[in-house]
């Protein structure tokens, strides 16, 4: 893009002493100049207090610069901080030039801009005087960027000298103008539109604070360069310019950079003061902002009539409000100072951290200076109707924006001095000229607001606003930076400053300028222009509501550059489209959590949600995320005319990496949010000097790990960066900023409070704050759990009621560190709706919801690696009938009805066979017995008991026929409950059958003994196909089982009905009817309760077949954690007397069957594992499970139940079957190699379990694949084919090799006992140095050296041997020395054995305990025994031991005391 000739380099600003008043010079482009060529607002705040004027021509100074006096730096403020404004002193030409340079270096600036920007600020305008510390602090970040951008040109550096805030503010303005001069030149964006709103103390400071100043400086630098402006004029350019400018600035000479950095740091630290100073001085500085928030728009116009007139004219004519930006001076450190300045400042500051521009309508906020209320609606310029919240927020944000918004005529440059924050909470992190129709008009309030808020009059912000105006700005290039405010400032929070990063930013810049113009137009329309008035209040506000995440406590708002790129190209595309779906900046809400940041709580515990999208009114931005927000990230409320507007937005979910949500839509919002400072909630509440350090660490990369400020960062490198893609216009353009991509999680057009039709969760994050309500989150219907948000702050709900109803709440962004929650529906506002994809929860599955899996947990947490594949398949295809209904769109109730019908068919078929075959055969046999005349009474009782079978068959035959009819006509009559209610009398047959069940089964067994014919008939039925090879008793139990199945199915059916429907009441009645019968079964049947339990388990475990088996009894269920390496995954176990169901829980409360383990061949043990507390090992022939219980009692209970379930004849064998002794294995008939051994953990062994050699760097461990022992290479030189490996050769120890050879199986020739020389043949083609060394290592040491002699006493007891009194890990130190060493100890035979590890074969030492005394050490200030105890012999201290806890210590003390006496 043609940048035009570079403007002359402005003279370097004279830096005043840190204690001197600092003058912030804002560069006004010719467009911003008033008709008379004077700065509209210069006289007001500029006159107040001393100000330094850069050495420039008068015309240049007058026209191009506004000097804003700043309050002397505080003593605590860094003295090197220079006026950020110095940087801005550069003439428009030079600024344009710088802008170009910055654009070129934009990317670097994006990375280094923070530091460079600082540097550039210092050299900027010597006349400007010392950079304001506040400006410097914010400037540090901004300056780094600017420095990079400006470093290319000395002039740029000089320009940077201006307060970074001013510079940034001006820059966006300039960029806008420059950008406008590009495609937008026709629109004539006016820099005069730039407004510098006052910012309330700290709250406002965050926008204006160093981060803002920096951004402003960066932007200012970028805009300073005409070429930059030109680049910026491109839709993508603004972002790029910003970033590049920042880079250029950071590229400035090191001295400049240092100065800028200092200034930035100072500015960040002192921003409050600067604002304070500027505000106090700027109280008169209406030139910065013509409209005093308290003053009516007219006053503002009057004060800045020239600028305002020019701006109004420009806006009216060209609607080029793009350029107009509010520059928000850095906030003062103290709210007190800020209050002082506030009273005098032309603009009040909104209590909220930042105000937002309502691009749609910006009403004068001048009067709102006094109160937030007035500020809220009028000042924001947002119609209360549209965004009451915005209005409220705006009001809260401060009259600053209101004032800015008020003046229809926005001064070319409105310098808003930030007053010191009365309180940190009071300070507005960002003062956005929401209400600036004219002043913010260029930015359309959106950008102006962002600029003002951010205090970064940066192109980025302009671009953001332009984007808000739908100006096609390169969102990718736009990066929001969070710059830590001065660590010295108690309440300051790092701010996010949008930066233009890529070259595309330059291209978007023009668009941004246009957007700013359009915004200005919109604002102007508010001012009274008919066209704009009509467009001023679109159905949906177009302003962005920015919520800084970094300002979690302080309420700082992070300005975000949001560029909505129009589908088309050209000015029209760049222009803000006044459509309902246009981006809307309701207002900037302080993340401090209280919209009325009036509360003088510097560190309020509450935090405003970064994104207010879809947060129900009752929840005043309730803190949802439990994890502290460690990265600052803006939340954007964006609506666009995207054709995908009504489409679902798909988002991918990644847990630890930077979230990458890529929105597959034509309109993609690109938002580069480069968060320079990430802080936890505790950090947010503390705004101490330590925060300055964050600039270096995170200002550019957003990632503490990225130390380099040079070069381009990759998207993956900056996890906290956010990018919104609205269009693919910037394809192929490199980012100067690293960003992760976050897709909007919310459907833009969906009506308020309606659950989004999302298949994946959206992320709504709030700044860290009180998270007490986050602990208990009920599961809802989403792939990830939806969170029901309890009303946290109902008292303040009213302020946000309309905001949440606003259609503009379309987009929510989240930082990768935020908690990710699917907020698609809020139970607080509407009853929980179970979606089709959620399986109905049965009342019978609820008792088994032992380990509900949080929706936020990644899928791999739900399933182990072994089951991931199967679980994915199950989730996608085999989720029983519940899957089909998802695909077919059927309701869950219909699915349950179909399941009821299918099971009824099988039941009736079974009844038919039972009635015809079994009942008929038994009746005939009984008749024959009657002829014999023996025991007639018993036969009659048996006949009576079986007589209910035909009646039961008829009952269910009728139920089946009617169910088939109902389901065939389901559309016309969706009900099944009345089928049961109509047959209430028929269920009496079931009740009678149940009452006599046990009795007639006993009679049947007795008669079978006396009547061979009856026994033959029963045996014939059991062996028939109809009998299913099951006993008659089992088949008769199925008759009763059906009632329990009804109970389960009807419960699920009831849970999926609307409580208001008649079917709901009928189902309750049917369920009550069935429950009466089942209760009788539980009371009268011996197996009733067990039968019910088995039915419930069968229903709750997916993948499980028929659990009802003869003799099967339920024993125990519970959840244990499966141990796989370092992973712990929940596993729910159902133990029956013959089988163990191994399942894992699912989100709907049910379980998926993983494996069915037979109890008969199971071996259970309680191994002692260092990192696995309360371990329980379950071994079978097919697998080995290592589980961990929550307590010792739970582990022991499971161990006892499993042991009791084992057959008696198997227990003795099982105990020894896994013993390491090969002889015992063979004696018990357990052949080696037939099943996998239990491998001894490597960490449990420090020496060879065969020869006792200590393992070392050269002597490595090897597992024997036959017995599982760990041996050295000298004891495992052989391989043998093992059965369980399908005769594949595997390494075995010498002992197992000898036993396997005895079996007589031939071993392949080459694999027979290998000589040492053949272990590593030298002829191997892979021979190398390592191979050569292995050759020597392979040589058996026994041939060269004597084996270590080990005393027999140390080999008598193995570390894991049986029969020990106690064993476990203890930490030991010798003779009072506090050097603890963890060892394994075993007490056996009154001797204490010491081992390196729990599986060692040879002890390190043994010490008889006879004669020793044990003295526990009591904890300080307590009479209770601590975990430390000492071992004395007479009065000599031998050892001190330290156990894991006091209980363990007590057990060891008792064991040692027992061993110390005979």
Curated annotation (Swiss-Prot):
It is found in: Cytoplasm, Cytoskeleton; Cell projection, Ruffle membrane; Endoplasmic reticulum; Golgi apparatus. Transmembrane segments: none annotated. Residues 72-82, 161-177, 858-887 have a biased composition (Basic and acidic residues). A zinc finger (FYVE-type) spans 1242-1301. Residues 1113-1207, 1363-1461 form the PH domain. Residues 676-685 have a biased composition (Low complexity). It comes from the Eukaryota. CDD domains: FYVE_FGD5, PH1_FGD5, PH2_FGD5_FGD6, RhoGEF. The keyword Ribonucleoprotein does not apply. Residues 892-1084 form the DH domain. SMART domains: FYVE, PH, RhoGEF. Zn(2+) 1 binds at residues 1248, 1251, 1272, 1275. Zn(2+) 2 binds at residues 1264, 1267, 1293, 1296. This is FYVE, RhoGEF and PH domain-containing protein 5. It comes from Homo sapiens (Human). The lineage of its organism: Eukaryota, Metazoa, Chordata, Craniata, Vertebrata.
